[in-house]
């Protein structure tokens, strides 16, 4: 590992990398049109009025417009039934104009999210949450890869560092980030340890890591002084403080002088998750729905 003693970390600019990815996707959509090929289509389903979900969904629709995808919006009332949603998903599964189906989580409590996610056809599961796609990743033959881990791999590539053989520590074991992230890093040749907020001697694990990915949803969980000199720090956390400021799961100010590379919050991982959703939708259109 490069030693960055008494230096400040290189910032990994997720915003800029995501913008460049969106530009490439938009260019490809234009080329497809010129070749007389279909425009990629994404269907976004939102159930209820959760304000955070509404913001995320509006971002995703705006992203679709920006790259020239056709986006279909389904804003459904909170009391929508499991059966009505199942029927909608079936209809979208059968619609040849739809390459990706996105079901915005969390869903109202009376709905079974697992059953609904499994109802989405694996070749239209652009979030990469279907057990089939997670299984493909586990078996080292990924098809549609979960967006946040996939975006993080793109950020890691941008550092130019060779990940092969690195000690990687993931803090947080969720289905959406931690677990698939572990599989992505195994695939990249890392030695992977998965921790969580109740891990004994979390500081010790973090201190041995050449690469730390923190996705625990707990502000300030990982202290800057735990970070090994020169390590790569990827902070997936996004927590709003009482003063309205967004902070990650890592104490940024104290990690900055120790890390070799670090993602800011906001402007690090978040934009990449959104860009990878578009990348997956394009991939589905180009490779899976020829």
UniProtKB/Swiss-Prot annotation:
Family that this chain belongs to: Belongs to the tetrahydrofolate dehydrogenase/cyclohydrolase family.
Descriptive protein name: Bifunctional protein FolD 1
GO BP annotations listed: L-histidine biosynthetic process; methionine biosynthetic process; purine nucleotide biosynthetic process; tetrahydrofolate interconversion
E.C. designation(s): 1.5.1.5, 3.5.4.9
GO molecular function: methenyltetrahydrofolate cyclohydrolase activity; methylenetetrahydrofolate dehydrogenase (NADP+) activity
Chemical reaction(s) catalysed: (6R)-5,10-methylene-5,6,7,8-tetrahydrofolate + NADP(+) = (6R)-5,10-methenyltetrahydrofolate + NADPH; (6R)-5,10-methenyltetrahydrofolate + H2O = (6R)-10-formyltetrahydrofolate + H(+)
Self-association and partners: Homodimer.
Gene Ontology cellular-component annotations: cytosol
Gene3D superfamilies (UniProt xref): Leucine Dehydrogenase, chain A, domain 1, NAD(P)-binding Rossmann-like Domain
Pathway involvement of the protein, from the record: One-carbon metabolism; tetrahydrofolate interconversion
Binding site for NADP(+): 172-174, 238
Alphabetic keyword roster: Amino-acid biosynthesis, Histidine biosynthesis, Hydrolase, Methionine biosynthesis, Multifunctional enzyme, NADP, One-carbon metabolism, Oxidoreductase, Purine biosynthesis
Domain of life: Bacteria
Known function: Catalyzes the oxidation of 5,10-methylenetetrahydrofolate to 5,10-methenyltetrahydrofolate and then the hydrolysis of 5,10-methenyltetrahydrofolate to 10-formyltetrahydrofolate.
Organism in which the protein naturally occurs: Pseudomonas putida (strain GB-1)
């Amino acid at each position: 590992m490069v030693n960055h003693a008494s230096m400040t970390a290189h910032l990994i600019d997720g915003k800029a990398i995501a913008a460049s990815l969106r530009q490439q996707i938009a260019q490809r959509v234009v080329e497809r049109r010129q070749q007389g090929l279909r425009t990629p289509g994404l269907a976004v389903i939102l159930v209820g009025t959760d304000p955070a979900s509404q913001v995320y969904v509006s971002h995703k629709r705006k992203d679709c417009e920006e790259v020239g995808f056709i986006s279909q919006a389904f804003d459904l009332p909170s009391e929508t039934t499991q059966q009505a949603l199942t029927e909608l998903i079936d209809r979208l599964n059968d619609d040849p104009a739809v390459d990706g189906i996105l079901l915005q989580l969390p869903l109202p409590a009376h709905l079974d999210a697992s059953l609904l996610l499994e109802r989405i056809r694996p070749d239209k599961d652009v979030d990469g949450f279907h057990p089939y796609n997670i299984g493909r990743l586990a078996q080292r033959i990924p098809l549609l890869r979960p967006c946040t881990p996939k975006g993080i791999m793109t950020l890691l590539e941008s550092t130019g560092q060779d990940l092969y053989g690195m000690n990687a520590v993931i803090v947080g074991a969720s289905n959406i980030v931690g677990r698939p992230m572990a599989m992505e890093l195994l695939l990249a040749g890392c030695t992977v340890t998965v921790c969580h907020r109740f891990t004994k001697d979390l500081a010790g694990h973090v201190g041995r890591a050449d690469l730390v990915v923190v996705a625990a949803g707990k502000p300030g969980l990982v202290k800057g002084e735990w970070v090994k000199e020169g390590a790569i720090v990827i902070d997936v956390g996004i927590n709003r403080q009482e003063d309205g400021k967004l902070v990650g799961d890592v104490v940024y100010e104290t990690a900055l002088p120790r890390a070799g590379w670090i993602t800011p919050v906001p402007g690090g991982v978040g934009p990449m998750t959104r860009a990878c959703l578009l990348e997956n939708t394009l991939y589905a259109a180009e490779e899976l729905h020829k």
